[in-house]
């Protein structure tokens, strides 16, 4: 596995692979890799000649009161996990390398951001889209891999690739879960033992919603109420949102039909957790 911190080296390497006719699978991350990331790496390994992984905690996507300084980092561990999972190139630039001077141009996301997490994190997805635009230009991959745990991010990346004509195939990989259903996340380490016991209620609530829809329920408000009620009954968490939209364009629906997302976010004392499911409804 080649490890590099320099943009120039990364570009040269990737260019060489492309000249050799090799396909490149790219997994952009903020590090502190867990099974969710490993699922992305495995999928990339199956589908490409070369797997490139980036680890970069992007300051642009953290709000003023968010956990940039506290976000877990362990680059040696990340390197080990990457190597064990067949990564060919490990790219871990510094903030100075990625942002050597203040940006004169930045990407602003116009659609798909005024709902879900985007609502309470203004500017967050502009930061995501800006760093991905940079990374896509540096790596120029054949395919880019993202987890459906952050389904709004997947929707934003879908729009970014489409609108900027990146010749990149977006591969969305299903959420990886603990045995009790809790979505794997770098932030789960913040949960107290009591909160960890309650946290699977998010996925259980979503499963209740799925069952109701399978039994014919088509009213989004009824579905949201059902999910909220389940979470309030089974946890001490404060609900940030429970929302239902069309997917991936994230538009409100009067009646459930087509591809939809049911998404939740809650705040425990020590961590904010998100989860979602997508369903195809006829």
Swiss-Prot record:
Catalytic residues of the enzyme: 37
A Gene Ontology biological process term: pantothenate biosynthetic process
Binding site for beta-alanine: 61
Entry binding sites for (R)-pantoate: 61, 153
Keywords: ATP-binding, Cytoplasm, Ligase, Nucleotide-binding, Pantothenate biosynthesis
Record-listed ATP binding positions: 30-37, 147-150, 176, 184-187
Entry's EC annotation: 6.3.2.1
Pfam families: Pantoate_ligase
Pathway linked to the protein: Cofactor biosynthesis; (R)-pantothenate biosynthesis; (R)-pantothenate from (R)-pantoate and beta-alanine: step 1/1
Gene3D superfamilies documented for this protein: HUPs, Pantoate-beta-alanine ligase, C-terminal domain
GO-annotated cellular components: cytosol
Source superkingdom: Bacteria
Location(s) in or outside the cell: Cytoplasm
Name of the top EC class for this enzyme: ligase
Functional description taken from the UniProt entry: Catalyzes the condensation of pantoate with beta-alanine in an ATP-dependent reaction via a pantoyl-adenylate intermediate.
Subunit structure: Homodimer.
Family of the protein in this entry: Belongs to the pantothenate synthetase family.
Other information: The reaction proceeds by a bi uni uni bi ping pong mechanism.
Protein name: Pantothenate synthetase
Organism: Geobacillus sp. (strain WCH70)
């Amino acid at each position: 596995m080649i490890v590099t911190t320099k943009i120039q080296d990364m570009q040269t390497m990737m260019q060489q692979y492309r000249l050799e006719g090799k396909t490149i699978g790219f997994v952009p991350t903020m590090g502190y890799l867990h099974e969710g990331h490993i699922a992305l790496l495995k999928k990339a390994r199956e589908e490409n000649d070369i797997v490139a992984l980036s680890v970069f905690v992007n300051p642009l996507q953290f709000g003023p009161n968010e956990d940039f300084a506290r976000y877990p980092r362990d680059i040696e561990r990340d390197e080990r996990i990457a190597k064990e999972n067949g990564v060919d190139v490990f790219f871990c630039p510094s903030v100075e390398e990625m942002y050597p001077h203040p940006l004169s141009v930045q990407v602003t996301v116009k659609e798909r951001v005024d709902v879900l997490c985007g609502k309470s994190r203004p500017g967050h997805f502009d930061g995501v889209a800006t760093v991905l635009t940079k990374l896509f230009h540096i790596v120029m991959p054949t395919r880019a891999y993202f987890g459906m745990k952050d389904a709004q991010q997947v929707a934003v990346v879908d729009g970014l690739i489409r609108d900027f004509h990146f010749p990149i195939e977006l591969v969305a990989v299903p959420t990886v879960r603990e045995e009790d259903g809790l979505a794997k996340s770098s932030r789960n380490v913040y949960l107290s033992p009591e909160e960890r016991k309650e946290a699977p209620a998010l996925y259980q609530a979503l499963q209740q919603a799925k069952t109701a829809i399978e039994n014919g329920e088509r009213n989004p408000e009824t579905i949201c109420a059902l999910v909220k009620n389940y979470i309030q009954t089974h946890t001490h968490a404060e609900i940030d949102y429970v929302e239902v939209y069309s997917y991936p364009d994230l538009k409100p629906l009067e009646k459930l039909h087509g591809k939809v997302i049911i998404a939740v976010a809650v705040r425990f004392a020590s961590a904010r957790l998100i989860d979602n499911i997508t369903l195809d409804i006829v």
